[in-house]
Amino acid sequence: MHSASRTRARTRVRTAVSGLLAATVLAAPLTLVAAPAQAATGDDWLHVEGNTIVDSTGKEAILSGVNWFGFNASERVFHGLWSGNITQITQQMAQRGINVVRVPVSTQLLLEWKAGTFLKPNVNTYANPELEGKNSLQIFEYWLTLCQKYGIKVFLDVHSAEADNSGHVYNMWWKGDITTEDVYEGWEWAATRWKDDDTIVGADIKNEPHGTQGSTERAKWDGTTDKDNFKHFAETASKKILAINPNWLVFVEGVEIYPKPGVPWTSTGLTDYYGTWWGGNLRGVRDHPIDLGAHQDQLVYSPHDYGPLVFDQKWFQKDFDKASLTADVWGPNWLFIHDEDIAPLLIGEWGGRLGQDPRQDKWMAALRDLVAERRLSQTFWVLNPNSGDTGGLLLDDWKTWDEVKYSTMLEPTLWKHGGKYVGLDHQVPLGGVGSTTGTSISQVGGGTPDTTAPTAPTGLRAGTPTASTVPLTWSASTDTGGSGVAGYEVYRGTTLVGTTTATSYTVTGLAADSAYTFSVRAKDGAGNTSAASAAVTARTAAGGGDVTAPSVPTGLTAGTPTATSVPLTWTASTDTGGSGVTGYEVYRGSTLVARPTGTSHTVTGLSAATAYTFTVRAVDAAGNVSAASAPVGVTTAPDPTTGSCAVTYTANGWSGGFTAAVTLTNTGTTALSGWTLGFAFPSGQTLTQGWSARWAQSGSSVTATNEAWNAVLAPGASVEIGFSGTHTGTNTAPATFTVGGATCTTR
């Protein structure tokens, strides 16, 4: 998986604490949930014409959405329902313009649902009283009624064969006791159960089939009927689904590698294949397109694409931009399908963290712009904050949105008309009846889509600056494409600093006595962006009094920690601006936790056996704040009152590499509040990346410390974490695991 064939070494983490409710097998009768009257009308079904998804009248339909995982995992229910409310989350998605949700499931779950056997769901019914007493299928179908209420559509994605938080790591659509025939059976059951409910509009046949020429098993794409030919499997599964429900869209992803001209699939040469992301290689469509016969008009191809924080692909290791990514990666792997009018595309997964690597931000902005410019459908990865290498649109509390990620990356790709987000339901506006942010596809005019950008704003002027702000005004743009001007983007140089629906904006956070250049662009309801206005330059005021920040605190040291506190000391700062140092700001990570006036402070309220990082800034009487000190890291002491522990360790390996899943269970009678799992590699293995915990390796010793969202394990509760690594031929499992210095039982 980390081979020279440019495979994506990510194991994009779908893992979470199981801790509010233990998973207990319940034998329960299958309980049907009646579909509302609107769901039976069938007027929201979609099909394709050329490279465009359209509704039953032939009107363009752009699927603009997000992924929400959990039903694919061991919990078998949406993650986050241990703290977030299902109704509020769903309504917020709709109000923010998300008109479709891709829901990962497993074949194992579909077969369990078919058999009427359920696990007790991991749901906090205090936060979700509406889910009291419901099994996982009933929760899913209750959520479908919420989607109907708020105008959201859904499609299912078989993410893995087994109900496993790391199940997507396995290369194929089968695994263990789950066979290819089982996958067909699961899809046929789903197509039958929801054939009359147009809330569910499609099926993503299998998530990210992958594997390289060095893999024991790998997914290929050719014209054979071989067991490992994903093209044949996807074609067969799609035909079985469409024989039951001919109205569903079927989404077919790519594989990982494709042979260069003249190279057979039997070759193991490292340079014999084109490689890209799991699910992102659709080169085979040119030679071996999916053939669905009479149902060809239900086919959508669905590649995945990620940035360098997921894996540092070779195209990120040189200077790149949207043009080079299009020419080198997107074009030959999948964009040709859209550009040559073969079929529509839906980018099934894309997204990631912002502000950690400029290359990551550049990649995401480039793909964002491609999606908006080509009017592509997409489902952003991901709503969940507990996706280890991408983060989510929601923060760890499952209530607060990452406004920067949403507004700068996802929102510009959402389908808009006349300044409102467009839903795929013909009766219900996106956001529900009375929505002020959304409209219905039935309210959007048919005919040729609006691809005309607004006029560039004119008359940009700067008002009177202060030492840190510049007010801007301009004349309104016009739009002849039919969707109307929806707002404006304000740029400082090439940096987007704000958006507004008005023709004025005040830029803040500027440095005193400094020159800045500003420009403005208009956007219309279809997402088209104008050329930039003529630029205007303004200089901020010089300011008065002390504008010099104190020196940076030095010598930050952590004393002996307890289970809940850490004492800190540092050397005093100096101030040459004249107002003098008045105090300090102490930060835990990026969170301000105290403002002492002296050069010491004890941080309290911490979790036991947990790693923390602290920094200090100095503040003077004029309000100037220094840069942060060098950080100091410290791990709190174990809590002697925590319970016992048990660990299950399983690894999947290949030549030179492996992935491991680790389940930590609190077997004690009191909650485990903050934990660090420790073990040693016995065979010289090397950790490369991990998820759902903060991983570190020193020599052979490895530690995994809880994330904020899985810090507390109730008695009997478990958390699933994992990592990938390399080995030199021997991959012996660790023999001993410890938490807080105590040895865990190994299962």
Swiss-Prot record:
CDD domains: FN3 (cd00063)
Domain CBM2 per the UniProt entry, residue ranges: 638-747
Keywords: Carbohydrate metabolism, Cellulose degradation, Glycosidase, Hydrolase, Polysaccharide degradation, Repeat, Signal
GO molecular function: cellulase activity; polysaccharide binding
Biased composition range(s): Polar residues: 465-475
Reaction(s) this enzyme catalyzes, per UniProt: Endohydrolysis of (1->4)-beta-D-glucosidic linkages in cellulose, lichenin and cereal beta-D-glucans
EC numbers on record: 3.2.1.4
InterPro entries per the UniProt record, alphabetical: CBD2 (IPR001919), CBM2/CBM3_carb-bd_dom_sf (IPR008965), CBM2_carb-bd_dom_sf (IPR012291), FN3_dom (IPR003961), FN3_sf (IPR036116), Glyco_hydro_5 (IPR001547), Glyco_hydro_5_CS (IPR018087), Glycoside_hydrolase_SF (IPR017853)
Top-tier EC class: hydrolase
Active site (catalytic residues): 208 (proton donor), 349 (nucleophile)
Signal peptide: 1-39
Disulfide bonds: none
PANTHER family, sorted: ENDOGLUCANASE, MAJOR EXTRACELLULAR ENDOGLUCANASE
Name the UniProt record assigns to this protein: Endoglucanase D
Protein's organism: Cellulomonas fimi
Protein's gene: cenD
